[in-house]
Curated annotation (Swiss-Prot):
InterPro entries from the UniProt entry: S100PBP
Molecular-function annotations in GO: calcium-dependent protein binding
Protein location: Nucleus
Region span, Disordered: 145-249
PANTHER family recorded: ASKOPOS (PTHR14455), S100P-BINDING PROTEIN (PTHR14455:SF0)
Subunit structure: Interacts with S100P.
Protein name, UniProt field: S100P-binding protein
Gene Ontology CC entries for this record: cytosol; nuclear speck
Chief location bin: nucleus
Composition bias type Polar residues, residue spans: 202-215, 227-246
């Protein structure tokens, strides 16, 4: 019988090869002469799965697989040990040691739509197979489960009134215990549905039926809240008396929380929505102030203004223009008494002589032109002063 090494065993078996550089004659070896001692358990090592077969059992399984599923099912019940339903899904107990623990060349089982690849019957296959069984949901008969669920919905409202009578009524409403048991317990493996061994998981609705039957024996104050009801009633107060629902697990409703930020925060004190606080430039709002004026004061100011205008029209020099007029009159008087004093309003008067040591020299136009470089390019476009004989003689 041919055996194939796993990748992990091939890597570990490479250390047993000779370390010489000479090429090893692999072609001289025969497959029948391979040592199967690597596949056996070492001292103190035990199998942690429930699928330990001998060579005779493996050959029988291959014959049954070729013969059909009808012969395979009674043989499977004799070979496979009886496994409890509760411990088969999550526990992997140790099994008896089997010296002839080999890998099957091909184990074709029809699951789904196509054949699965061959798997070795070792601990890796046991772990992978048990993980697959956990994810498979057992089929159930809806014609049997639906009436039971409908009766639980009706009887849940009367649960607080008379739990003892409800317990008796539940027993009377189940005329076929074998069929109702199929709702709460998974069906056995049949050749028409699947070829997986062992029990399968029950549906969420079946777990709900078992929980309903167990809750009827517990007082209302001590009943634990189920897990799916805590999720579905997250935003509501958990009240089993007024809920009146033992719904299927597929009808669990989860509240959706909006992730968008609220632009208006609700003020609990005033009951109004606050605007979003923004940082930036604050534009002040001008507040209007009311000023009170007496009618008599307005008439008095009006008379003063009219009298000033009329006086200025009649005699502009002698008219008093207020404070500014008084200042102008004072400066005129000082300038008349002291001619050397420059009037502040005389902006055209240039009196640079008082800042110089030498007296101011006066020049004619031609002299000024000669002193300021007549040949300069700035004066090239100036016209000739032909009207002056002095300038014309200078040009010649």
């Amino acid at each position: 019988m041919t055996c194939s090494l796993l990748p992990s065993e091939q890597s570990s078996g490479a250390s047993f090869l000779p370390k010489s550089n000479a090429s090893f004659p692999w072609g001289s070896l025969d497959e029948d002469e391979l040592d199967d001692s690597l596949l056996e358990f070492s001292d103190g090592e035990e199998d942690d799965g429930h699928f330990s077969f001998t060579e005779e059992e493996i050959e029988m399984l291959l014959k049954d697989d070729d013969g059909g599923h009808n012969e395979y099912r009674p043989r499977k019940s004799q070979i496979l040990p009886d496994i409890p339903q509760e411990n088969s899904l999550y526990s992997l107990g140790p099994a008896a040691e089997t010296p002839g623990f080999l890998k099957l060349p091909q184990l074709s089982t029809s699951v789904g739509h196509g054949p699965t690849p061959s798997k070795s019957l070792n601990r890796h296959f046991v772990l992978e197979k048990n993980l697959i069984k956990v994810t498979v949901v057992a089929p159930f008969n809806p014609t049997v489960c639906d009436p039971v669920l409908d009766k639980d919905k009706i009887d849940s409202s009367k649960e607080t009134e008379n739990p003892a009578s409800l317990r008796e009524q539940t027993r009377e409403d189940d005329p076929q215990p074998n069929e109702s048991k199929r709702c709460t317990e998974p069906e056995g493996v049949s050749p028409n549905t699947s070829a997986w061994d062992g029990p399968l998981l029950s549906s969420p609705s079946n777990n709900n039926i078992e929980q309903t039957a167990s809750d009827k024996n517990i007082p209302e104050s001590k009943k634990p809240t189920p897990v799916f009801s805590q999720i579905s009633n997250h935003s509501e107060v958990p009240n089993r008396k007024n809920s009146g629902s033992h719904k299927s697990g597929c009808e669990v409703r989860i509240p959706v929380v909006s992730s968008s930020s609220n632009r208006h925060a609700f003020d609990k004190d005033s009951g109004e929505a606050k605007g979003e606080r923004r940082l930036g430039k604050v534009i002040p709002v001008l507040q209007t102030r009311t000023r009170m004026f007496s009618q008599s004061e307005l008439e008095k100011q009006k008379d003063i203004y009219l009298s000033k205008v009329i006086a200025h029209i009649e005699d502009p020099g002698d008219s008093n223009q207020g404070t500014l007029g008084e200042l102008d009159a004072l400066m005129d008087q000082v300038h008349m008494q002291h001619p050397d004093w420059q009037h502040p309003s005389d902006l055209t008067t240039r009196n640079y002589a008082r800042f110089r040591q030498r007296p101011l020299q006066r020049y004619s136009l031609s002299q000024w032109v000669d002193r300021n470089k007549r040949s300069h390019h700035r004066f090239q476009r100036l016209p000739d002063f032909s009207y002056s004989p002095y300038v014309s003689s200078h040009q010649q």
